[in-house]
């Protein structure tokens, strides 16, 4: 288990460092830039040039006490404030993070702005220029329902590390008050704060499991944790797999309609027979 603290500004980084020195601090911290400076300013309260200089100082201080710093890039596929952004600029921001010493990069769609084709295009660009897959983390919010599709698109481009939350919790930002997500700083640009969270880890892991991808996660235990999270929060969360569980792998007797075997026998059909006896074994249809 790696404990990560989100530390947007230097004061928070300093508190994390103090905690590490006292024996309780995080193993890893996160700072974030947005390619759209309006979005960045709304999130951090400062300019991009000033923030980059601050981040460089923080990386150096964190390294001195053994804390790794994750550099996050946001508004890669567009900004809810300024609109369209350029993928090429996000690749440049990624390089800048690594150049000043970030341990890894979170490529984030915090606002659900990424269509799957652009996700594949972006990560193909990134891996073409920075091929070490250990450096890249995909982070998709499900504001428009594209989360698992985007995970698949990123996987097809070559990404191997993904982030998710139980029940798809999170938002702008992912704050909790009395165990309930609350709105972030400033005007709230979503219509419903309950439908903006990070990709549901349950849905993502169930999908990967069905694709025979070994995640190393106990899928049934994960689904139980998701159910427990719903009880903790006190409402239905945004994981379809919590509700519907895994795809069945064996006959479910309780859902059978009675009488199939008797009807096949009455019609003179063999068990397992699926076509009339006078049909050829293979179809000759050629399109």
Question: Where would I find each of the regions flagged by the language model?
Answer:
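Catalytic cores and adjacent flexible loops of soluble metabolic enzymes
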Residues: 1-287
């Amino acid at each position: 288990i790696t404990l990560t603290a989100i530390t947007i500004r230097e004061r928070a980084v300093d508190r994390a460092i103090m905690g590490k020195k006292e024996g309780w601090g995080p193993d890893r911290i996160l700072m974030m830039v947005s390619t759209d400076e309006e979005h960045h300013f709304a999130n951090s309260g400062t300019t991009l040039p000033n923030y980059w200089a601050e981040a460089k100082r923080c990386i150096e201080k964190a390294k001195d006490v053994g804390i790794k710093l994750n550099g996050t890039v946001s508004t890669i596929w567009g900004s809810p404030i300024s609109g369209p952004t350029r993928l090429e600029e996000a690749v440049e921001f990624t390089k800048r993070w690594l150049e000043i010493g970030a341990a890894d990069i979170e490529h984030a769609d915090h606002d659900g702005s990424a269509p799957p084709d652009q996700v594949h295009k972006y990560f193909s660009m990134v891996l073409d220029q920075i091929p070490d897959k250990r450096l890249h983390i995909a982070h998709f919010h499900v504001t428009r329902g594209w989360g698992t599709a985007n995970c698949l698109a990123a996987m097809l481009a070559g990404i191997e590390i993904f982030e998710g939350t139980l029940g798809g919790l999170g938002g702008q930002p992912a704050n909790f008050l009395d165990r309930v997500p609350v709105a972030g700083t400033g005007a709230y640009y979503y219509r419903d704060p309950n439908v903006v969270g990070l990709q549901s880890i349950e849905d993502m892991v169930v999908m990967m499991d069905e694709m025979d991808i070994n995640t190393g996660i106990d899928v049934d235990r994960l689904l139980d944790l998701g159910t427990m999270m719903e009880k903790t929060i006190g409402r239905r969360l945004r994981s379809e797999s919590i509700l519907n569980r895994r795809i069945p792998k064996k006959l479910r007797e309780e859902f059978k309609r009675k009488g199939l075997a008797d009807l096949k026998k009455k019609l003179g059909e063999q068990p397992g027979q699926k076509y009339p006896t006078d049909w050829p074994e293979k179809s000759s249809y050629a399109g």
